[in-house]
């Protein structure tokens, strides 16, 4: 039970990542008050966000860029430019753990993780806040078939991933490595 609570707390702590670039360290953080309302740390006013769920580093969006022969970083550059131009101040992603982990939950340093780092860096440059769900617990295929990756989530069904001792150990290893990961940008 303590492991589950620790895992939940870790995930919640990662939920809202303050998008601060190196030039601007004074961007306020967000906290949740006693009534469950997100507030800015500097003004105590309610924090509200308008954003997009965007998945180019992973799954079908990643593959689609490959099918079309489009440079993925150039696509991220263009898309983030338009997010900012449209006044979006938030970005959300479910990280496809099946694409950045192995069967034991080790974090894989691969193109998917590198593109996620790049995307986060570009969003931070534009002052766009980032909301991360650390894992998906589903495949990377939609609308196509799932692609085999060797990620731990593929070894357990969606319910067992939350109750099987080996699945929980793999998740703990993955989350710990993800939290310790340093963005290469």
Language model features by range: what are they?
Residues 2-8:
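Sec-dependent signal peptide recognition
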Residues 20-24:
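Low-complexity, Pro/Thr/Ser/Gly/Ala-rich linker/spacer regions in secreted
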Residues 10-18:
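Hydrophobic h-region of N-terminal signal peptides that target proteins for export
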Residues 6, 15, 57:
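Residue-level marker of positions within ordered structural domains that often coincide
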Residues 8-9, 98:
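A periodicity- and composition-biased signal for non-globular, repetitive helical segments
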Residues 25-185:
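Active-site mouth of glycoside hydrolases
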Residues 1-2, 19:
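Extreme N-termini of proteins with methionine-enriched Sec-type signal peptides or N-terminal signal-anchor
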């Amino acid at each position: 039970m303590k492991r589950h609570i620790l895992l939940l707390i870790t995930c919640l702590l990662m939920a809202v990542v303050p998008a601060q670039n190196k030039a601007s360290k004074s961007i306020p953080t967000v906290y949740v008050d006693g009534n469950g309302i997100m507030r800015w740390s500097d003004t105590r006013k309610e924090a509200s966000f308008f954003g997009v769920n965007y998945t180019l580093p992973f799954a079908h969006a990643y593959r689609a860029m490959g099918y079309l022969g489009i440079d993925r970083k150039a696509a991220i550059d263009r898309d983030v430019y338009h997010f900012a131009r449209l006044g979006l101040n938030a970005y959300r992603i479910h990280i496809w753990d099946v694409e950045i982990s192995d069967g034991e939950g080790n974090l894989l340093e691969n193109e998917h993780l590198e593109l996620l780092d790049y995307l986060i860096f570009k969003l931070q440059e534009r002052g766009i806040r980032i909301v991360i769900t650390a894992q998906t617990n589903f495949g990377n295929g939609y609308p196509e078939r799932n692609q085999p990756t060797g990620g731990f989530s593929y070894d357990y069904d969606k319910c067992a991933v939350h109750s099987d001792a080996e699945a929980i150990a793999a998740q703990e290893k993955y989350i710990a490595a993800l939290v310790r990961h340093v963005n290469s940008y």
